[in-house]
């Protein structure tokens, strides 16, 4: 996470450490190794630059500019206007926005073992009103930690990920065959956005349940396609309720709220069907030949989570994997299509790794650094989440401002990725930048 925690030096009116780069014109006394000790106390919270404290007026201007779906551009404009930190009220949500990697390191180093995250209001409202079970996405404190530890071992650990490789390879091969078939038939249009959604869902269900749903066949299960459409609708209808209380949308039974509820209902209904169906299939199968049986089977075997908690987490992972995976792939293909020289380099690397690995996909994945760098570069230019959010556990000084505990701080991913002081030629798709061994670039490893 970059720099070690320095927040212990930044409490109250104590002296603070900063880099040799002077910030906001505050004087400093030089010490050894380029570090300075600030000679002033941190400035108060209300002095953080802001476009205005009237959250509803700010929200009105945002809507007037049709900026709800372009809020990442607003972040960039505000950073250009106010500097590397600013605060803003939008509706009933007040946040401090940061983009400096050193500030981000301080933020995450101060969060403790149970981070307090910003929970998406419409998602919380739906789950609470309809009493739906929640998983790691919406849990807090000890409940979040218990689920996260269990999922780390079965979903995030390197040994667990190795089990996914043959399952993902099978889906990938089927996806390529499907596209080749269309090319040979002369019906390939070039628009594969819907196919990428199907590929993402087929991949996730295969590693979740150890079986395919047939999303890449000519005839697709209507319920499975309905699930994908519901995920899109759930995300789309969330945006208007991020700054206005979802209870207002529910009170007036707006179409936004009704569509949001309908989307979540489909997600829960179908995810529950899949989980129950594969659960009983697994119980009836006595011998699977020692092959990996999927995340669901592994979670059931650990006894660390109740069946209800498992179902809630399976639902969230299925819903969260479709849009995020497919959009990243779509942007990655777009960037490679616009940089044909880089595309040829990536193809050459993959072919060489394939020959060297002699069919061992796990070994092959260890020999494609440029491919991995290209995915990092795609996420720099097109991050899945516009911001990452944390509520401060304790007071914290950022950019020489004292920010009180419980304040919502948002890391502007898009703004940081496009900032020329952090990335040379930030608009350029340049994967080799991630292969640089520059020791000063520790924040982005």
Swiss-Prot record:
One GO BP annotation of this record: cholesterol metabolic process
Pathways per UniProt: Lipid metabolism; C21-steroid hormone metabolism; Steroid metabolism; cholesterol metabolism
Transit peptide as recorded in UniProt: 1-36
Gene Ontology MF term list: cholesterol monooxygenase (side-chain-cleaving) activity; heme binding; iron ion binding
Names of the cofactor(s): heme
Localization in the cell: Mitochondrion inner membrane
Cellular component GO terms held in the UniProt record: mitochondrial inner membrane
Membrane disposition: Peripheral membrane protein
EC number in record: 1.14.15.6
Swiss-Prot/TrEMBL keywords: Cholesterol metabolism, Heme, Iron, Lipid metabolism, Membrane, Metal-binding, Mitochondrion, Mitochondrion inner membrane, Monooxygenase, Oxidoreductase, Steroid metabolism, Steroidogenesis, Sterol metabolism, Transit peptide
InterPro entries: CYP11_CYP27_families (IPR050479), Cyt_P450 (IPR001128), Cyt_P450_mitochondrial (IPR002399), Cyt_P450_sf (IPR036396)
Catalysed reactions, semicolon-separated: 6 reduced [adrenodoxin] + cholesterol + 3 O2 + 6 H(+) = 4-methylpentanal + pregnenolone + 6 oxidized [adrenodoxin] + 4 H2O; 2 reduced [adrenodoxin] + cholesterol + O2 + 2 H(+) = (22R)-hydroxycholesterol + 2 oxidized [adrenodoxin] + H2O; (22R)-hydroxycholesterol + 2 reduced [adrenodoxin] + O2 + 2 H(+) = (20R,22R)-20,22-dihydroxycholesterol + 2 oxidized [adrenodoxin] + H2O; (20R,22R)-20,22-dihydroxycholesterol + 2 reduced [adrenodoxin] + O2 + 2 H(+) = 4-methylpentanal + pregnenolone + 2 oxidized [adrenodoxin] + 2 H2O
Family per record: Belongs to the cytochrome P450 family.
UniProt subunit comment: Interacts with FDX1/adrenodoxin.
Task of the protein: A cytochrome P450 monooxygenase that catalyzes the side-chain hydroxylation and cleavage of cholesterol to pregnenolone, the precursor of most steroid hormones. Catalyzes three sequential oxidation reactions of cholesterol, namely the hydroxylation at C22 followed with the hydroxylation at C20 to yield 20R,22R-hydroxycholesterol that is further cleaved between C20 and C22 to yield the C21-steroid pregnenolone and 4-methylpentanal. Mechanistically, uses molecular oxygen inserting one oxygen atom into a substrate and reducing the second into a water molecule.
The name this protein goes by in its record: Cholesterol side-chain cleavage enzyme, mitochondrial
Organism: Oryctolagus cuniculus
Upper taxonomic lineage: Eukaryota, Metazoa, Chordata, Craniata, Vertebrata
């Amino acid at each position: 996470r970059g720099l070690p925690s320095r927040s212990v030096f930044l409490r109250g009116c104590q002296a603070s450490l900063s880099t040799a780069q002077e910030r906001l014109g505050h004087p400093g006394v030089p010490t050894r190794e380029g570090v300075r000790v600030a000679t002033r106390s941190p400035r108060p919270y209300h002095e953080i630059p802001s476009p205005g404290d009237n959250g509803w007026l700010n929200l009105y201007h945002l809507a007037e500019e049709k900026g709800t779906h372009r809020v990442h551009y607003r972040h960039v404009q505000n950073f250009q206007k106010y500097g590397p930190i600013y605060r803003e009220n939008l509706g009933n949500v007040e946040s401090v926005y940061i983009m400096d990697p050193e500030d981000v390191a301080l933020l995450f180093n101060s969060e403790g073992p149970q981070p307090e995250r910003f929970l998406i209001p419409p998602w919380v409202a739906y789950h609470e009103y309809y009493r739906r079970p929640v998983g790691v996405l919406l849990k807090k404190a000890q409940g979040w930690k218990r689920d996260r530890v269990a999922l780390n071992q079965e979903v995030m650990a390197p040994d667990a990920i190795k089990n996914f490789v043959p399952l993902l390879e099978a889906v990938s091969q089927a996806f390529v065959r499907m596209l080749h078939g269309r090319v040979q038939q002369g019906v390939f249009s070039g628009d594969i956005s819907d196919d990428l959604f199907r590929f993402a869902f087929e991949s996730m269900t295969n590693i979740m349940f150890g079986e395919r749903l047939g999303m890449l066949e000519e005839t697709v299960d209507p319920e499975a396609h309905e699930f994908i459409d519901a995920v899109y609708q759930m995300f789309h209808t969330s945006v208007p309720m991020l700054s206005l209380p979802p209870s207002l949308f529910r009170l007036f039974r707006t179409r936004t709220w009704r569509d949001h509820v309908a989307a979540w209902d489909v997600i829960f209904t179908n995810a529950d069907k899949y989980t129950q169906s594969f659960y009983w299939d697994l119980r009836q199968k006595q011998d699977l030949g020692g092959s990996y049986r999927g995340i669901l089977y592994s979670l059931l075997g650990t006894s660390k989570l109740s069946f209800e908690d498992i179902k809630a987490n399976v639902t969230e992972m299925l819903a969260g994997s479709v849009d995020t995976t497919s959009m990243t792939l779509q942007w990655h293909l777009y960037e490679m299509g616009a940089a044909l020289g880089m595309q040829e380099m990536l193809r050459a690397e993959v072919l060489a790794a394939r020959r060297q690995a002699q069919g061992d996909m796990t070994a092959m994945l260890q020999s494609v650094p440029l491919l991995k760098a290209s995915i990092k570069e795609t996420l720099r230019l097109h991050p899945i989440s516009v911001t990452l959010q944390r509520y401060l556990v304790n007071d914290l000084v950022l950019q020489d401002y004292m920010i009180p505990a419980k304040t919502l701080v948002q890391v502007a991913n898009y703004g940081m990725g496009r900032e020329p002081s952090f990335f040379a030629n930030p608009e350029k798709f340049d994967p080799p930048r991630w292969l640089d061994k520059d020791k000063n670039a520790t924040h982005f490893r």
